[in-house]
């Protein structure tokens, strides 16, 4: 699909009276959606937003956030979505390098005096910049799990290439409906939005409420395994046909239970820099993350995964300049340890996470996969702690779905002795920050405080 106009305007021409969006209890067809976006875009234009303006959008997923995002894009703006939970000092360090002029904070106040505050206002008109697929449109902060986040900058065509690749694997028809279940300040949330726009299907955006209620009428969702477990265990009445799972090891029991209820489960491997998913497959309990999707290339160099793709970011934004992602050979070196077998990629773990205990290398992700296979485990992280005799020893930080269980016996015949955690700690609520990734650095610091 090649668009010659804004995707929502394209679908207005093709199927204007078909439902495009469900916003809480309101339904908008493509014609009504375009009218709403036109008024919002005209409102932003009156406030000074022009092509190339940098706008920070600090908001949770709400119907208003989604419509504002589309309107800012239609103005030709470069949107930086920000997690409202990010601390002020971090943003004060980050924002000056990102060449922003405006801040839109729909449910709060702008705490950055250097940025002009934008307000949601509807103005009669149909303001729109010219559709240019190669225009820079989004700046997405990387997870920052090992340092200060960077802003990866994507074009429209990169986001659409990402969507096209995923939808070559996951059927998403005209009358299917994908819940915007992940935050738009993460690239995985943006991926849902762009798949909806690419397919011309339906999307649902609801204010925060129990997942089962949010899923009412939805055929597709992007979830973490914990969420799907809870839906299945509670025998929730859902209309799901397909789920894209991410964020953790995926037990085969989970996908088999889902299949029995008519839900196909997909999983894969993605990065902020590549506008979400790079490799994917229908979940089968095997360790690989699937084959590269169309438009993506993968190769292994010295055990490291290298990538290039049509969905790749143009670069990292720094003081008005784009800093290239690629190395001298034109590839993005991920710092992920990986292996390719029969065209399928297996991620062993982060090169940066490898540590040594008594001379033996421990890759945390390998140990985590073994422990995560226990049915009581929702999440597990292996953290190195300094040890005078061994250099480092592994500590497990756990989230369980019920009362804590003793896993130290369970792992004895499944992990080498040096891999077995010397302590088992429960993941504290303060580290579950509403993001998709939990910072390993924050975990290390917390574990050190427990010593």
Curated annotation (Swiss-Prot):
- Which pathway does the database say it acts in? Quinol/quinone metabolism; 1,4-dihydroxy-2-naphthoate biosynthesis; 1,4-dihydroxy-2-naphthoate from chorismate: step 5/7; Quinol/quinone metabolism; menaquinone biosynthesis
Could you list this entry's UniProt keywords, alphabetically sorted: ATP-binding, Ligase, Menaquinone biosynthesis, Nucleotide-binding
Which InterPro entries does this UniProt record tie to the protein? AMP-bd_C, AMP-bd_C_sf, AMP-binding_CS, AMP-dep_synth/lig_dom, ANL_N_sf, ATP-dep_AMP-bd_enzyme, MenE
By what name is this protein known? 2-succinylbenzoate--CoA ligase
Q: What is the lineage of its organism?
A: Bacteria, Pseudomonadati, Pseudomonadota, Gammaproteobacteria, Enterobacterales
The answer to whether UniProt assigns keyword Nucleotide-binding to this entry is yes
Q: Which gene encodes it?
A: menE
Is rRNA processing among the key words of this record?
Answer: no
- Family label: Belongs to the ATP-dependent AMP-binding enzyme family. MenE subfamily.
Which PANTHER family does its entry note? LONG-CHAIN-FATTY-ACID--COA LIGASE, NONRIBOSOMAL PEPTIDE SYNTHASE PES1 (EUROFUNG)-RELATED
């Amino acid at each position: 699909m090649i668009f010659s106009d804004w995707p929502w305007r394209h679908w207005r021409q093709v199927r204007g009276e078909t439902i495009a969006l469900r916003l809480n209890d309101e339904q908008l067809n493509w014609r009504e959606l375009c009218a709403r976006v036109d008024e919002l875009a005209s409102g932003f234009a009156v406030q000074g937003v022009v092509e190339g303006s940098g706008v920070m959008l600090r908001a949770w997923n709400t119907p208003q956030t989604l419509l504002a995002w589309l309107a800012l894009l239609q103005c030709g703006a470069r949107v930086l979505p920000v997690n409202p939970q990010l601390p002020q000092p971090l943003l004060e360090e980050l924002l000056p390098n990102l060449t922003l002029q405006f801040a839109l904070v729909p449910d709060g106040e702008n705490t950055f005096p250097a940025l002009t505050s934008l307000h949601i206002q509807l103005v009669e008109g149909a303001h729109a910049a010219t559709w240019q697929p190669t225009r820079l449109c989004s700046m997405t902060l990387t997870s920052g799990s090992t340092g200060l986040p960077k802003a990866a900058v994507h074009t429209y065509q990169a986001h659409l290439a990402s969507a096209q690749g995923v939808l070559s694997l996951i059927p998403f028809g005209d009358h299917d409906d994908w819940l915007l279940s992940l935050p738009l300040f993460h690239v995985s949330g943006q991926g849902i939005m762009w798949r909806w726009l690419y397919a011309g299907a339906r999307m649902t955006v609801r204010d925060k409420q129990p997942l089962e209620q949010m899923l009412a009428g939805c055929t597709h969702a992007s979830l973490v395994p914990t969420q799907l477990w809870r839906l299945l265990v509670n025998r929730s009445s859902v209309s799901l046909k397909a789920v894209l799972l991410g964020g953790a090891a995926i037990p085969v029991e989970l996908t088999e239970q889902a299949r029995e209820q008519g839900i196909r489960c997909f999983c894969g491997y993605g990065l902020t820099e590549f506008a979400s998913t790079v490799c994917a497959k229908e979940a089968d309990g095997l360790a690989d993350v699937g084959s590269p999707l169309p438009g993506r290339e993968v190769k292994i160099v010295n055990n490291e995964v290298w990538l290039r793709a049509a969905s790749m970011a143009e670069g990292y934004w720094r003081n008005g300049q784009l800093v290239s992602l690629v190395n001298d050979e034109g590839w993005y070196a991920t710092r992920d340890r990986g292996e390719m077998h029969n065209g399928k990629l297996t991620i062993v773990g982060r090169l940066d996470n490898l540590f040594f205990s008594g001379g033996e290398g421990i890759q945390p992700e390998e140990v985590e996969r073994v422990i995560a296979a226990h049915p009581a485990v929702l999440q597990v992280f292996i953290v190195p702690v300094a040890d005078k005799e061994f250099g480092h020893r592994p500590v497990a930080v756990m989230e369980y779905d019920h009362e804590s269980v003793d896993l130290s016996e369970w792992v004895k015949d499944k992990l080498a002795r040096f891999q077995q955690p010397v302590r088992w700690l429960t993941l504290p609520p303060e580290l579950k920050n509403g993001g998709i990734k939990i910072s390993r650095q924050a975990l290390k610091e917390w574990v050190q405080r427990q010593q």
